[in-house]
Amino acid sequence: MSLQINTILKSRTEINDLEWNQFIDDSPQYIIYAKSFYLDAVHPNWKALFCYNGDQILAVMPLCEKSLFCFKWITKPSWTQYLGVFFCPLQGKRHRYYYTLKTVLHSILDQLKGKMHIFNYNFVPSFQYHIPFLWQNYSVTPYHSYHLDIDSSLSEIYSNFSTSVTNHIKKANKQQLLIIENESIDGLANLLQAKNIIHKGENLSLIRLWENLSKEACCFNMYVTDHNQSNMYCGGAFVIDKESIIFLASATNPKFKKSGAVSFMVWNVIQKAQNMKNIKYIDFEGSMIAGIENYFRAFGSRAVVYYNIQKKNHLLSSLKFIADKSNLRII
């Protein structure tokens, strides 16, 4: 039986939160970044493509559009590691399964034509069918994230840390550093901005995101201080997903960058995670920067491949870069 795919673009006001979030929850490509309360914080005017076969929704794709003058691009927002296409659970023979994926993706790609000048998304690791994008001259590039499984004992997890990590933890303990958890993200957001890791817009986006996540009880902040709580050594923002804790962001006070505070904080997050129901791993989110990638590996984490899919107009990419550096308003 052939599919009759009808793909419709819906604005944010046309999307029902309960239906959307239930679809994302049930999708094999599930990730918290695609939930409506997350997208509302990081890109309030998001839209989505809905792929129907009759009355059944086969797939959805959240779209985060930005524009400058008459040019448009679709890119992942700040604080969002992955997005992409989210399918409903598909049953049946394997050849039929791939036929459905191909047909739906062709319909989505047809809809994207003419709607944007640049496309750049990281797709969730569980999305593994990229061929239709290659056929349409998109580039598909493998990236790495790192997951630290926490299903073994704490002593076994600790034994797999590199010597540098264990030395950092010992150093922090000798200084009698303390772990503080509180609800405010302001201290971390301000430190990130002071170190020029993020700009003002990303600061506001992070604060808005934390308000939404706090309402859903799916986040926590961790700060490392001295025993008098007079100095903040570092801070971290963590998102609680179905089976993972996502290491969303961290920053270190430059005065204490050799204190071992970050490794000490991560070790405390691991201990906290082991006492949380359903949590199976820490998601470090990954980085293609050599020094950061090396640090994540030092905790004994495993590499997880995901794919960046993009189509670029090089002239417009340069224009976007100039706009970002000049702090031009991009809506």
Predicted feature locations:
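Active-site/acyl-donor-binding loops of N-acyltransferases
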Residues: 2, 65-66, 126, 134-156, ...
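A conserved beta-strand-loop-helix scaffold within acyl/acetyltransferase catalytic domains
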Residues: 3-71, 124-258
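Short, high-confidence coil segments that cap the C-terminus of an alpha-helix
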Residues: 44-46, 114-118, 277-279
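Aromatic (often tryptophan-rich) hydrophobic motifs at membrane interfaces
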Residues: 54, 106, 218-321
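Conserved acyl-donor/pantetheine-binding loop and adjacent beta-alpha core of acyl/acetyltransferases
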Residues: 66-84
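A short, internal acetyl-CoA/4′-phosphopantetheine-binding micro-motif in the GNAT/acyltransferase core
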Residues: 80-95, 151-152, 250-259
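Soluble or luminal CAZymes and related metallo-dependent hydrolases
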Residues: 96, 100-104, 202-205, 265
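Non-catalytic accessory segments adjacent to catalytic cores
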Residues: 99-142
